[in-house]
């Protein structure tokens, strides 16, 4: 993995991951019933997207 990603991972606290989880849950709540397989798949997919977006924001901040 890149040095940048390793540095980003160190910034992820339980609180920041919980915030990403909560944001993700709100994003998919209207589309899938919680507890279903579809919810789990959507949650995992959207969490991955949200973490990548957080990484991109972090990279942009590091360049400033």
Regions found by a protein language model. Give the residues of each.
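N-terminal acidic leader/helix
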Residues: 1-35
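Short, charge-rich amphipathic interface segments used for partner binding and complex assembly
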Residues: 26-64
